[in-house]
């Protein structure tokens, strides 16, 4: 009260009122604010009052020789007065116009090369097709996506070294270009940018766009490859989407897609071999994708997919700490658990040994078509909030979560025996047994789960055992949400270990990945995948196995010949003959092998009966474990082209034909 009274007294004096209302603002603090530091405090205002002046621009004195004092309209382009405080000339904005129209021109040949990513983007947009706009609720989830199409996959450090080498080759500083891609790019770019007049800094900035993958964590509904992300602002809003087909593909998307296909094929093939881990490594090291070694791509490419991550783990690379189950990526966001083995009885009274997770935990589950939040305690699902594209996708997520929860009612819902096996004919572990069982048919699981009345919560509805939505009732603990669950945003990578059966574990021993998690989806790779390993010959069917086996023998004939005479057993055990065995009828394998080995022994014993063509022809049959019998064969059967084809022991056949005069060998009509 005292203060107010004091202020009133002050205001009653006319002088005070005048000072407070009429005087100019020349307060020291304000002057300081607008004059200290180099940072412009009010850029918009500064721009306005600068442009209101006649000569807002300053330029080097040389400009007076390069630009006339007046333009064609007689307007002054620069003033003879010096800029205060510097020896520069005051210039009118009209001078810029004059320069743009009449100034010297420079070669534009380097522009498309330097601004390559922009030129290519324009082409993609020109040839892209935009479809109709649909208004509907968009379920977007944040995913880590690739922002700039058309990039290589160098690390920031590698790119920095390449840029310094290309743009500032004479700059001092230790730079070691190690990877093959670094050397190739450096050579290419040096050639391209010879005599380039564009500012080096700009060139460096544009090179960075081309060399490094830029990822952002963005809300997306729909395509996640970089050619879709570059038009994200045009294709999806909060309540609308516009159909779009890109007008071109870019190599980085193709590499990602082809890498996933190659990794899946390799993991599937490795699973059925005698030593899966060794086979996987052998295949990764001998495979090329679009002409680049797969191991180099794995080291640089951040794609997270189950098969790709198994290959990375095998190579000793770090991978994401989230784990995979039922095709969903699980990330624990709260709580912890300890594992304990427990024996449980299924509805069919079959005993299963499962590793029970004891403790309260919360997870996010992210799949291709559905996402969820799961809260669980020991063998109990507390809550599952799920969102997905359609009924089917939501059902998939619910099944995975129910199995993962390890609830008793789920185990009791099993009807019939669980005997699922993997590609190598080994029984799956109990959790995957349960998963496969309910993925085939979840009717009993949903019926036995139980339902509960639900409260009306904004954005959430219930779902009934037959997967229809409801506002009154829902499966116990399960709700369907309009909002998606964001993918785990962290790019943190952890050290993992892998066993010989390709199970990947973190340092605490939790299984993050196993071959059971690798998708069976087949796709056509965008880039050529060259598998040099004999284990992958069968990927293109029986014919390819037949041709490749004989080609291998011919390519390595010099060493094969010596081994054939000196250490045949070692030769017979070569892994290159393994795929061929699948072509020989099971019942005949060991008989053929015994017969051919005996024949070869006779050739070795009787000098001068060495018959190159016959050895090449029969050698693959000798690889199976032999059966000692006196059986003789005039022809051997191989299963190609959907039926048995004969290879004649003495003589030619369509499957194996050698022309003595032209010295041409054809396998199934193809040159070997």
From Swiss-Prot:
Signal peptide: none
Gene Ontology biological process terms in this record: 7-methylguanosine mRNA capping; cap snatching; symbiont-mediated suppression of host cytoplasmic pattern recognition receptor signaling pathway via inhibition of MAVS activity; symbiont-mediated suppression of host gene expression; symbiont-mediated suppression of host mRNA transcription via inhibition of RNA polymerase II activity
Compartments (UniProt record): Virion; Host nucleus; Host mitochondrion
Disulfide-linked positions: none
Pfam families: Flu_PB2_1st (PF20947), Flu_PB2_2nd (PF20948), Flu_PB2_3rd (PF20949), Flu_PB2_4th (PF20950), Flu_PB2_5th (PF00604), Flu_PB2_6th (PF20951)
Keywords from the UniProt entry: Cap snatching, Eukaryotic host gene expression shutoff by virus, Eukaryotic host transcription shutoff by virus, Host gene expression shutoff by virus, Host mitochondrion, Host nucleus, Host-virus interaction, Inhibition of host innate immune response by virus, Inhibition of host MAVS by virus, Inhibition of host RLR pathway by virus, Inhibition of host RNA polymerase II by virus, mRNA capping, mRNA processing, Viral immunoevasion, Viral transcription, Virion
Any single Gene Ontology cellular-component annotation: host cell mitochondrion
Reported function: Plays an essential role in transcription initiation and cap-stealing mechanism, in which cellular capped pre-mRNAs are used to generate primers for viral transcription. Binds the cap of the target pre-RNA which is subsequently cleaved after 10-13 nucleotides by PA. Plays a role in the initiation of the viral genome replication and modulates the activity of the ribonucleoprotein (RNP) complex. In addition, participates in the inhibition of type I interferon induction through interaction with the host mitochondrial antiviral signaling protein MAVS.
Oligomer and partners: Influenza RNA polymerase is composed of three subunits: PB1, PB2 and PA. Interacts (via N-terminus) with PB1 (via C-terminus). Interacts with nucleoprotein NP (via N-terminus). Interacts (via N-terminus) with host MAVS (via N-terminus); this interaction inhibits host innate immune response.
Family: Belongs to the influenza viruses PB2 family.
The name this protein goes by in its record: Polymerase basic protein 2
Organism: Influenza A virus (strain A/Chicken/Hong Kong/220/1997 H5N1 genotype Gs/Gd)
Lineage of the organism: Viruses, Riboviria, Orthornavirae, Negarnaviricota, Polyploviricotina
Gene name tied to this protein: PB2
